[in-house]
Amino acid sequence: MTDYLHSPLHAEHEKLGATFTPFGPWEMPLKYDNELEEHRAVRNAAGLFDLSHMGEIWVNGPDAAEFLSYCFISNLTTLKEGKAKYSMICAEDGGIIDDLITYRLEETKFLVVPNAGNADTVWDALNERAEGFDVDLKNESRDVAMIAVQGPKALEILVPLVEDTKQQAVMDLPYYAAMTGKVARKYAFICRTGYTGEDGFELIVYNSDAPELWEELLKAGEEYGIKPCGLAARDSLRLEAGMPLYGNELTRDITPVEAGMSRAFAKKEQDFVGAEVLRQRAEEGPQAVITGLVSSQRRAARAGSEVYVGENKVGTVTSGQPSPTLGHPVALALIDTAAGLEPGAAVEVDIRGKRYPFEVSALPFYKRDK
């Protein structure tokens, strides 16, 4: 029997009747009741997510910005205090180790948030690359919890719980920015980020404070129709928003060039791990790119389904399912650039031995009203 890691909110999930699923070394909520209702709650009102399985790594010191710029494909020296940046950490051969978000709290203080399944790998990579840099690394992945409130009502739910002197600052906080403050009397790192395609916030708090904050957010959101949401809804939401998932769209066999992230290092002058390979790959152009597919049929493509134009295989589906918001199947696929497919182009997807018509689509599939 596998001994899974549990979130500090595990007892809260049990009280809410959650169905659990393994996620890397963790056991996390898959859903609470109906994943479609959870999905729709986020699109129409708000959803509450436990993201405590995500990693949290602090990077402090005079060389912190230069160090992270060496480790990641993006230039972190230009990131302003209080802002966040989406980036990737790669191996020497350009393969993606993880995609992650980095926050700059102060001139020499950064927080790196890697994906749950890659947190230990990222921690090891940062330590291996730290030689020669004046930095201090601290892994708090097991010491803190992350709770996300996402959806069009997220701001209305969160603000009344924020300490009076910080409420206006939270209301004015731009997307991909962060600040500190008390939420429900608990010290929190408040980030206006998310993985759903909606407005929302991700709150990092000490493990001991997480259960009370979770309960306070549920209580505050009750009048708005907030629902606790599991990983199933999180996956369908991010797919509609065209956001990649590590292990599906992003792997060690994919480089940021195929993932559409060449712009992150296009003007970067500093050296970074994988730079030589990635700059050459970017100059040559990707052999395949992550592409959106849609269908008017009911049958959804799944990861591993092959994509065809006539008798020629042109790609493989990396993620796919029916879209609860749009009412038809959507998918992401790694498509050969040689096929020359533009939005609107017709393809076929082999689903259990039978081919179904799909169409190439621009991304994202869903975009919220601002």
Curated annotation (Swiss-Prot):
Its EC number is 2.1.2.10. It catalyses: N(6)-[(R)-S(8)-aminomethyldihydrolipoyl]-L-lysyl-[protein] + (6S)-5,6,7,8-tetrahydrofolate = N(6)-[(R)-dihydrolipoyl]-L-lysyl-[protein] + (6R)-5,10-methylene-5,6,7,8-tetrahydrofolate + NH4(+). GO terms for molecular function: aminomethyltransferase activity; transaminase activity. GO terms for cellular component: cytosol; glycine cleavage complex. Transmembrane segments: none annotated. Keywords: Aminotransferase, Transferase. SUPFAM superfamilies: Aminomethyltransferase beta-barrel domain, Folate-binding domain. InterPro entries: GCS_T (IPR006223), GCS_T_bac (IPR022903), GCST_C (IPR013977), GCV_T_N (IPR006222), GcvT/YgfZ/DmdA (IPR028896), GcvT/YgfZ_C (IPR029043), TrmE/GcvT_dom1 (IPR027266). GO terms for biological process: glycine decarboxylation via glycine cleavage system. The keyword Transferase applies. The glycine cleavage system catalyzes the degradation of glycine. Belongs to the GcvT family. The glycine cleavage system is composed of four proteins: P, T, L and H. This is Aminomethyltransferase. It comes from Corynebacterium aurimucosum (strain ATCC 700975 / DSM 44827 / CIP 107346 / CN-1) (Corynebacterium nigricans).
